[in-house]
Swiss-Prot record:
It comes from Mus musculus. TPR repeats lie at residues 4-37, 39-71, 73-105, 225-258, 260-292, 300-333, 360-393, 395-427, 428-461. The modification N-acetylmethionine is found at residue 1. Residues 191-233 are annotated as: Disordered. The modification N6-acetyllysine is found at residues 8, 301, 312, 325, 344, 446. Residues 205-233 have a biased composition (Basic and acidic residues). Pfam families: STI1-HOP_DP, TPR_1, TPR_11, TPR_12, TPR_8. The TPR 1 repeat interacts with the C-terminal of HSC70. The TPR 4, 5 and 6 repeats (also called TPR2A domain) and TPR 7, 8 and 9 repeats (also called TPR2B domain) interact with HSP90. This is Stress-induced-phosphoprotein 1. GO terms for molecular function: Hsp90 protein binding. There is a cross-link at residues 123, 210 (Glycyl lysine isopeptide (Lys-Gly) (interchain with G-Cter in SUMO1)).
Amino acid sequence: MEQVNELKEKGNKALSAGNIDDALQCYSEAIKLDPQNHVLYSNRSAAYAKKGDYQKAYEDGCKTVDLKPDWGKGYSRKAAALEFLNRFEEAKRTYEEGLKHEANNLQLKEGLQNMEARLAERKFMNPFNLPNLYQKLENDPRTRSLLSDPTYRELIEQLQNKPSDLGTKLQDPRVMTTLSVLLGVDLGSMDEEEEAATPPPPPPPKKEPKPEPMEEDLPENKKQALKEKELGNDAYKKKDFDKALKHYDRAKELDPTNMTYITNQAAVHFEKGDYNKCRELCEKAIEVGRENREDYRQIAKAYARIGNSYFKEEKYKDAIHFYNKSLAEHRTPDVLKKCQQAEKILKEQERLAYINPDLALEEKNKGNECFQKGDYPQAMKHYTEAIKRNPRDAKLYSNRAACYTKLLEFQLALKDCEECIQLEPTFIKGYTRKAAALEAMKDYTKAMDVYQKALDLDSSCKEAADGYQRCMMAQYNRHDSPEDVKRRAMADPEVQQIMSDPAMRLILEQMQKDPQALSEHLKNPVIAQKIQKLMDVGLIAIR
């Protein structure tokens, strides 16, 4: 047994020095002499993992568990190898099995948490939570017109808050169109084989994680360093930061190759509010970690802490930069959420910083000049810039709506009119321009309603009175073909929703077969409202 211990110690020293092949030879010779020694298989598993031979690391991890089923380290070795092999579900189960035997084993707990995080990453990411969601939808002509429909926005919010509903919504063509825009692929053109294809396996880890240390067989200096770290952790929890720093500093002196002791020091300075020192130590820790091939998760934590320090100082651009560095090393939900939060704050800050009413007025005047010359596209650009400079000026939206109407972009005109009315409910132009857009779309019933609202505000408004009369006459004299009526009606998002409702389709079929059923259905105010809408657009008529 003395020879076995000598070979084991020799292997440990070789592994610590980075001489992996020598370490493997020592452990293998020791195993020949003592094939039932579980520690030897555990150590050799660590050596194989460090070499990158993860299959053999896994086999030795399994042997360790077989020889000593109640030893947490064996499960840790086996799970780590499975993780390297991208067999995340099996790794998770192995960590869970190990915790049944050693419920308080920190390595197993941390390993399980990391596995759960990585498995969460592999699930389908919800595209409806993109930070620039509405900008993407606005920029694409396939979804731009849908945004004016309140039911569409409700649908988007529902899928943002409850992505599990996506499967039940795929029959809605609007959802498929939206996914095509957000994912940048034409889902409608994918053939069955493409749709049924399984996703490609994830790429191998970008950096080789460092195998876990062999607690029982660590050199004396590393054992002492771990003890100092624990003392430092106890002091840190008690907020005795000076004492914690002393212990972490001592641990670093004993084991200068372990970046954890430096990041722990950085954590103390973070709590003390000394963010410059915190960042300096994190950078040093990353340097040490790179030199010693540290686990990429530890590198990611150091970058995330730098990001957090900038976030605390409200330097969101710098925070985003380091959060992205952290995510490039290892993606975790917490850091991703923090990065998105910083991006949202920064975007709002930039928007507010851009506001300048004086420059907005200049752009508005330029837009007016272009509009009078008939250069509507250029006028629209000036009004858009003016809105960015002063987004609370209702008249700017009204002016841009006039441009959109001239350019026959009626849905966008309606959207701007709605914004104008919301900002300034008593501004007549907001109503008359909205009504004009509806009139141009030949939606005379809605147009008359809006003209009437303008007249309610100012009964002497000639533009509203004339518009109301025009719409009334047009409605009376229209002789559209059934195809024209149907095409125009189905362009209305509200009508689309009504006609895609299975219950409403059943009611309409009943009305065709049994006209007497109408009176029963009209007792329901919701159904009555929908039937009235279909009558208004000319899709149905009641005789």
